[in-house]
């Protein structure tokens, strides 16, 4: 498995005191270096259009690393400089889903990726 490695995406969930806020992410992905991956984060239980969705990742034994965010209502994005050339964060308001696409994958991109709102 020299050229195949796993990028793992977990289910993220958040619970509010008086509401059921939930973010459900797409499942595990196995990709080859040089390809791209697009993962999703579906929101429910809160007003998606009034939120911002953040994406972070954590490689084994490393600290959380911020990738970027999108303001859902306006579509404005902000990316960490490290990922500027390789990441695109989008959203689909009709399905309350945010997406993070990472291109030109490298072995160093092997990590657990999380969304948060």
From Swiss-Prot:
Residue pairs linked by disulfide bridges in the UniProt entry: 41-115
Residue span of region Complementarity-determining-2: 70-77
Keywords: Adaptive immunity, Cell membrane, Disulfide bond, Immunity, Immunoglobulin, Immunoglobulin domain, Membrane, Secreted, Signal
Sequence segments annotated as region (Framework-3): 78-115
GO terms of biological process kind: immunoglobulin mediated immune response
Pfam families listed in its UniProt record: V-set
Signal peptide segment: 1-19
Domain of life, per lineage: Eukaryota
SUPFAM superfamilies per the UniProt record, alphabetical: Immunoglobulin
Region (Complementarity-determining-1): 45-52
UniProt keyword Phosphoprotein, yes or no: no
GO CC terms: extracellular region; immunoglobulin complex; plasma membrane
Residue ranges constituting the Ig-like domain according to the UniProt record: 20-117
Record carries keyword Disulfide bond: yes
Principal subcellular localization: secreted
Region of interest: Framework-1: 20-44
InterPro entries named in the record: Ig-like_dom, Ig-like_dom_sf, Ig-like_fold, Ig_V-set, IgHV
Name of this protein: Immunoglobulin heavy variable 1-58
Encoding gene (name): IGHV1-58
